[in-house]
């Protein structure tokens, strides 16, 4: 049997020739495009290969470019789908959309969100904008409308992005936080209420257009007092209590404490133990009023008071005032009434004193009103005596017995000192007032102040007293000149008198006198000048200079003799010990028994200090042989004092 001849199976793959491969290498992109266009595909339904449209990526997702083509495709699809079940489903979907409309809105919202996401993410790849194929500038110049549309789209997207940025994203929410922390004033609260009502009405109008809402506007000034108080209670309930306490404190200060303190300062009222208490209470009330006013000021300005130290200050002062109120209860029951009476009496006495000071003084008025004023004066004197007695009783109760004894001793000592002339002069004030300093030139004195010189008559005593109170003493007016100078002796004469007084004080008696006056004190220059010829100390008739020098020499000798007596040293010789009949006193038995027991030692060694000194000197001499002394150069080189030893080397070995 012969073999059946078989046929060779050829592969369906088209084998490329060498010529085709070479041509493909030299083909350009344009040549490849034209070759691809000329090829007719055999499998029409084969869409496995990717089309060029899939490679296209939109740069700007512009609306209205391909909308018409898409709508046409949608309508064609719907017409095809109407046949059969799909048509029924589409109709059912349309019916539901028309009836409810919720799903359509939700889908529309989802589509809008997707579109916004697409718009916000345009131009994600920068490579799409470079190395484009559109090299023809004529084509670019023809698309001016597209470029304008792109610019508008960019501007719109940027505006949307900027609009979405809030103040919190930029870090500018500090001001809003500070405004929220700050407490609002009454006007801001009312404005805020108006804005809130407006926003509520706007929301209601947007939500339901059919319903009509009326706006309510509130003005605090137009409200009644009760409504205003309700607003105050709601915003700051503590203000009302603080205002009432402020009014009470101010009233207490003005009506009770300040008048009493003024009287105490003037000295019209004497409160021994209660003055300090009233001062403390006045200070506390003043600080409390100050703190309340500061709190109200902060509240009116709208500043935050939540953590302010004025609150702690108010609480502290309030606690102190409560403690003082407890002390008020411990005061005697009639204390306030007595204070009021004392204030009234002080005011009346002050008015009477002012009337007395301002009343005109004249002899005729005093004589006329003297008889009528006697009973009033007697009554006033009795009242003053009663008051003095009460004050003395009160003082005696407070002062202890020991303090009274000390005061008595002090008064006795002062009296003794006055009598001796140590503390003050014994001359009374009335005598001093009567003595006036007389001028040397009484002729030049002007007597235009004759009213001040009161007469010593007994019938005009009241006028004299009032003139002392009201009028002030005026110095007599004089005319300046050489006549005002006092007449004095020559300087030589005054010097001689002074030396005579010094000699008399030293104890040297002169022939002219003692140099003392009648009272025993040394006379002054003014007394010598005033006495003149009546001076007994000086004899102006027969006095020579030789006698004066003799007196001075005697004075010096007397002074030297007195100094010699004081400072001289007399040799006082101590008497030797008395010797007995048998000679000097004998030593004791112990001394005799101990004699000869101590051995004889070297003088340099038995004293430790001397011993150590000798040892030190030996060490110093031995040290000189080891280390040579440093000798300073005193002059030019004079050779070696001890000779040159060639064996010694003073150099330093390296």
Swiss-Prot record:
Compositionally biased tracts (Basic and acidic residues): 182-212, 364-387
Residue stretches of biased makeup (Acidic residues): 44-56, 64-82, 103-114, 171-181, 524-546
GO biological process, one term: chromatin organization
Any Gene Ontology CC annotation: ribonucleoprotein complex
Compartments reported by the entry: Nucleus; Nucleus, Nucleolus
Coiled-coil boundaries: 140-160, 243-263
Motif Nuclear localization signal 2 mapped to chain: 608-615
Phenotype on disruption: Embryo defective arrested at the cotyledon stage, associated with enlarged nucleoli probably due to the over-accumulation of pre-rRNAs.
Biased composition (Basic residues): 1-16, 552-561
Positions of region (Disordered): 1-23, 35-145, 164-212, 362-397, 470-492, 509-654
Biased composition (Polar residues): 588-599, 645-654
Motif (Nuclear localization signal 1): 2-9
Function of the molecule: Essential protein during embryogenesis. Involved both in gene transcription regulation and in processing events critical for proper rRNA biogenesis and nucleolar organization during reproduction; contributes to pre-rRNA processing at the 5' external transcribed spacer. Binds RNA.
Assembly behavior: Interacts with NUCL1, NUCL2, JMJ14, NOF1 and MPP10 in the nucleus.
Family membership: Belongs to the SAS10 family.
Extra information: 'Thallo' is the Greek goddess of buds and shoots.
PANTHER family: SOMETHING ABOUT SILENCING PROTEIN 10, SOMETHING ABOUT SILENCING PROTEIN 10-RELATED
Record's protein name: Protein THALLO
Gene source species: Arabidopsis thaliana
């Amino acid at each position: 049997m012969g073999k059946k001849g078989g046929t060779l199976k050829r592969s369906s793959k088209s084998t490329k020739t060498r010529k085709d491969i070479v041509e493909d290498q030299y083909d350009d992109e344009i040549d490849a495009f034209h070759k691809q266009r000329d090829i007719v595909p055999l499998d029409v339904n084969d869409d496995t290969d990717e089309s060029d449209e899939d490679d296209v990526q939109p740069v700007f997702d512009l609306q209205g470019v391909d909308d018409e083509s898409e709508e046409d495709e949608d309508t064609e699809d719907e017409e095809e789908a109407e046949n059969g079940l799909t048509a029924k489903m589409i109709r059912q979907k349309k019916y539901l959309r028309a009836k409810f409309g919720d799903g359509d809105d939700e889908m529309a919202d989802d589509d809008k969100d997707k579109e916004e996401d697409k718009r916000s993410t345009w131009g994600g790849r920068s490579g799409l904008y470079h190395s484009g194929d559109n090299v023809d500038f004529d084509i670019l110049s023809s698309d001016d409308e597209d470029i304008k549309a792109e610019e508008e789209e960019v501007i719109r997207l940027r505006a949307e992005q900027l609009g979405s940025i809030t103040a919190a994203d930029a870090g500018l929410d500090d001001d809003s936080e500070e405004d929220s922390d700050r407490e609002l004033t009454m006007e801001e609260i009312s404005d805020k209420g108006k804005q809130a009502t407006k926003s509520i009405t706007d929301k209601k109008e947007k939500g339901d257009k059919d319903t009509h809402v009326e706006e309510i506007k509130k003005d605090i000034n137009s409200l009644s007092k009760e409504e205003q108080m309700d607003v105050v209670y709601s915003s700051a309930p503590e203000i009302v209590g603080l205002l009432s306490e402020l009014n009470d404190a101010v009233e207490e200060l003005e009506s009770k404490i300040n008048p009493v303190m003024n009287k105490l300062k003037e000295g019209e009222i004497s409160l021994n133990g209660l003055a300090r208490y009233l001062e403390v209470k006045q200070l506390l009330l003043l600080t409390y009023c100050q703190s309340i006013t500061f709190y109200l000021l902060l509240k009116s300005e709208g500043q935050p008071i939540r953590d302010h130290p004025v609150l702690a200050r108010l609480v502290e002062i309030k606690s102190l005032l409560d403690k003082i109120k407890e002390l008020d209860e411990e005061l005697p029951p009639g204390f306030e009434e007595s204070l009021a009476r004392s204030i009234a009496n002080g005011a009346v006495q002050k008015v009477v004193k002012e009337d007395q000071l301002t009343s005109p003084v004249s002899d005729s008025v005093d004589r006329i009103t003297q008889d009528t004023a006697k009973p009033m004066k007697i009554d006033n004197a009795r009242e003053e005596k009663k008051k003095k007695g009460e004050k003395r009783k009160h003082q005696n109760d407070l002062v202890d017995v020991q303090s009274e004894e000390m005061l008595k001793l002090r008064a006795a000592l002062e009296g003794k000192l006055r009598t001796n002339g140590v503390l003050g002069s014994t001359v009374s004030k009335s005598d001093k007032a009567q003595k006036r300093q007389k001028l040397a030139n009484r002729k030049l004195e002007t007597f235009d102040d004759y009213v001040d010189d009161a007469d010593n008559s007994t019938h005009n005593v009241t006028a004299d007293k009032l003139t002392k109170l009201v009028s002030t003493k005026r110095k007599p007016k004089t005319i300046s000149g050489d006549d005002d100078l006092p007449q004095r002796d020559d300087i030589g004469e005054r010097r001689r008198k002074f030396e005579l007084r010094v000699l008399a004080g030293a104890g040297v008696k002169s022939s002219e006198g003692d140099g003392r006056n009648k009272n025993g004190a040394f006379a002054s220059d003014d007394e010598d000048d005033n006495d003149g010829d009546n001076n007994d100390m000086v004899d102006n008739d027969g006095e020579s200079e030789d006698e004066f020098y003799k007196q001075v020499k005697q004075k010096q000798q007397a002074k030297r003799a007195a100094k010699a007596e004081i400072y001289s040293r007399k040799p006082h010789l101590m008497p030797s010990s008395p010797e007995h009949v048998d000679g000097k006193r004998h030593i004791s038995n112990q001394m005799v028994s101990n004699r000869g027991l101590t051995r004889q030692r070297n003088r340099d060694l038995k004293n430790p200090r001397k011993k150590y000194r000798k040892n030190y000197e030996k060490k110093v001499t031995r040290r000189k042989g080891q280390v040579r002394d440093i000798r300073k150069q005193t002059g030019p080189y004079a050779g070696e004092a001890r000779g040159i030893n060639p064996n010694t080397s003073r150099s330093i070995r390296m």
